[in-house]
Amino acid sequence: MIERRETRAKTDGAVSASRSRGRRARALTAISLAPLTWLAACAEPRDPGGQPLAEVKAPTATHAPSAKPGPAPPPTLRPSVGAAAFEPRLVRLEEGAMGTRIVIQSFTTPELEEASLKGAMLAALEEIRRLERLMTTWRDDSEVSRINAAAGGEPVAIGPDTFAVLEKSLWIAERSEGTFDISFEAMKGLWRFDEEKSDAIPSQKDIDQARKKIDWRKLSLDREARTAKLGEAGMRINLGGIAKGYAVDRAAAVLEQRGLAAFYVQAGGDLYVRGKKPDGKRFKVGVRDPRGKHDLDYFATIEVEDHAFSTAGDYERSFIKDGKRYHHIIDPRTGWPASACRSVTVWAKDAFMADAIDDAIFILGPEKGLALVESIDDAGAVIVDASNKVWISKRLEPHVHVFRRPTDAP
């Protein structure tokens, strides 16, 4: 039997999410498809003298490392002067990669000064950019582009990273009734929610024609040879719905290898939180109101430690036409935007899993979606369905505080 709870409104509190400079705010992370903001201790990090803390300057994409993976260098430990009076400082990196905003934050410790944290963050960013070059469809020489170019032909040899993401994609497709299908790229251009945004609605004829090239079962993987093959000419894959979660986990691994014990890594709506705040308390994640006024408008919070989050929502890449909302989460079984939910926030042990299942849960709807998430170890979900009801998976209930109903609007 599916374990679920329908949560009604609670009015026992509210979250302050001011961006004003220097103003103290709660330790809260906004989780949404929009870029997230980590409010760990104050709205803007400052040093003990009150001066704003400069962000890490990241290299441009042209300075990304080679595609050849290698072990992260050992941590650089530099004992701080006056450790007895040590006060942690927030260090932040913000850059663009994988078509979204990358944010990495951590605190200085007596063993890891600001320079060491900056070096670790830049190494983590470089790892994300290395993976981007392998899995993007914007480069003809990426492994994903080479698989697409060879559709209907011979298998394509790929590296272990891309193979791992493809393998997980097929695993989720099978468990989600095909609602997560990376061969959905065949519909590219019909719906335009990104760079070339348009409110033009494709015809049913065009949708049906494109859907003939969508079938995850025609992607063949050979683990021994480490190859991938699309079985029909004209088929295409896109890893945009899962690769960012994998990249977040790999970046987190780099930070851990550099000696960081408390940090967060965010790529768009995918987030991993490691450790606790300097005061020993857990961080909190804010769950965005899908019809809220801005991306820091929350209706619930979740305590988090050593876990990841990923959100799928109908409110970012979307448009409203003739009173109806159209958004980028397309049901591959119909070719039309899924209509069962407004938002899904997935909690999991790693970002790879969270990113892999949030869209599937969104498309399946609350009952089947909760059944899916409960079937996966150490995973949970908060769902706002199309009628604005809030559903919380049994495993996640003890960690969630819903303090008001989400806004009810189209």
Predicted regions: what they are:
Residues I2-E6, D12-V15, R19-P410:
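Mature catalytic core of soluble alpha/beta enzymes
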